[in-house]
């Protein structure tokens, strides 16, 4: 009995020593590397048969290659339209022909149709904007026109977005990154006036967009310099400019405002002045021991080229 008690105490002491020994607490771990089959995604051959797009996608997923989901939808913007509804066709020379002639009678009939359509559109606009009138709107449109061009000369894109639509913005700023624009409004030769109003429905019934065409005849000065400071287009002398500017507003939007949407260029308008392109003319090879004054250089005038769309 005493021997068994001593044996039990010895075993208990060894067990306690094994528990308190940190070296014996960590049991040996045997790590055996096992090699598994590694699958690679191999694209099918060019002339392989019975290989559909679904089969290739399933094999790619089995190999662990996840193809991103590509949507074929194009984002659209409903804050403005993508064009001009029924663009106003100004008479040639902006003059009225005699009603006794055939062309004058046709012009008069066309004007009556446009006036009737404009009156119906004005009624729709006044349902959403009670302060809209054809007498006060031209002055507001001219102020908006001047402010938009002043922001263009200062390259204030944040303010310009509030004055022009998303369709007009890229047309105004395209190609002007390395150019310097100087524009100024001198005076109005004739008071601006509304020549056409359109308010059609788009996408769904009741979604109205209003477009007002304003005739502006004024004096402006425009000069465009390239990045080297050379004059590309225009001059500092004021010129008479006759423009038909279109302003648009999303009538359903309670926070919508009138913004400049585009310009109508008549077919009889004179062509624009070509922009002088700055090019590098290769000169003659100069000997290091030769003076520049000894070389006769031929001066050539730059050729005017059409450099706009």
UniProtKB/Swiss-Prot annotation:
Tell me, how does this one assemble?
Answer: Component of the mitochondrial ribosome large subunit (39S) which comprises a 16S rRNA and about 50 distinct proteins.
GO CC field: mitochondrial large ribosomal subunit; mitochondrion
MF GO annotations: structural constituent of ribosome
**Keywords of this entry:** Mitochondrion, Ribonucleoprotein, Ribosomal protein, Transit peptide
> What is the recorded function of this protein according to its Swiss-Prot or TrEMBL entry?
Component of the mitochondrial large ribosomal subunit (mt-LSU). Within the mitochondrial ribosomes, required to direct the nascent polypeptide toward the tunnel exit and position the exit at a distance from the membrane surface.
What's the source species' lineage? Eukaryota, Metazoa, Chordata, Craniata, Vertebrata
A Pfam family this chain is assigned to: Tim44
Q: What organism does the record attribute this protein to?
A: Xenopus tropicalis (Western clawed frog)
Name under which the protein is recorded: Large ribosomal subunit protein mL45
Which InterPro entries does the entry link to? mtLSU_mL45, NTF2-like_dom_sf, Tim44-like_dom
The record's similarity note reads: Belongs to the mitochondrion-specific ribosomal protein mL45 family.
**Classification via SUPFAM superfamilies:** NTF2-like (SSF54427)
Gene name, per UniProt, is mrpl45
Instruction: Provide the protein's localization.
Output: Mitochondrion
**GO biological process terms held by the UniProt record:** mitochondrial translation
PANTHER family, from UniProt?
Answer: 39S RIBOSOMAL PROTEIN L45, MITOCHONDRIAL, LARGE RIBOSOMAL SUBUNIT PROTEIN ML45
Q: Where is this protein primarily located?
A: mitochondrion
